[in-house]
């Protein structure tokens, strides 16, 4: 998040009091939208944790999602090298664009975004009816059963690779990834935590 020194160094005069703000998906890196903030909008964004702009058409502060419920939850805010533009990393609740797409720039989503969306769906399935949802049934069966499924799918993935069956390997790898995500959710872990750990190992 912005430090006090970074906030003091922002060049509001250069931008006539309205600073362009690029909002980027904190997980996938997809550019979600462009908006403008004045100092008050920035203050409210930091205080509320939800992206708030100054609307040039409404001439007032406008929290993204205040009508639709599709909020942008702030993860981090950073200035550019000239202190006249802000980059906001956020996790969106629902589609960002009023047209129903994830980005106001059209279908620019990276394939990794689907994993994030799947992860959110799997988290929601924790409270679903086990009678109507396979995922909910897995959660209800307990950690040992979920772990067993991960092991089974891992073996099947390896076997498909040993016989060079690319079709089956793709299917089994998909099953393995799905069950691994369920296991992570069962343990209150997410894919971002795993990715960060991989990054640390790579350094």
Swiss-Prot record:
Database matches in InterPro entries: His_synth_HisIE (IPR023019), HisE (IPR008179), PRib-ATP_PPHydrolase-like (IPR021130), PRib_AMP_CycHydrolase_dom (IPR002496), PRib_AMP_CycHydrolase_sf (IPR038019)
Pfam families cross-referenced by the UniProt entry: PRA-CH (PF01502), PRA-PH (PF01503)
Pathway: Amino-acid biosynthesis; L-histidine biosynthesis; L-histidine from 5-phospho-alpha-D-ribose 1-diphosphate: step 2/9; Amino-acid biosynthesis; L-histidine biosynthesis; L-histidine from 5-phospho-alpha-D-ribose 1-diphosphate: step 3/9
GO CC terms, sorted: cytoplasm
Keyword Zinc-finger: no
Class in the EC hierarchy, top level: hydrolase
Biological process according to GO: L-histidine biosynthetic process
Name under which the protein is recorded: Histidine biosynthesis bifunctional protein HisIE
Source organism of this protein record: Shigella sonnei (strain Ss046)
Source lineage: Bacteria, Pseudomonadati, Pseudomonadota, Gammaproteobacteria, Enterobacterales
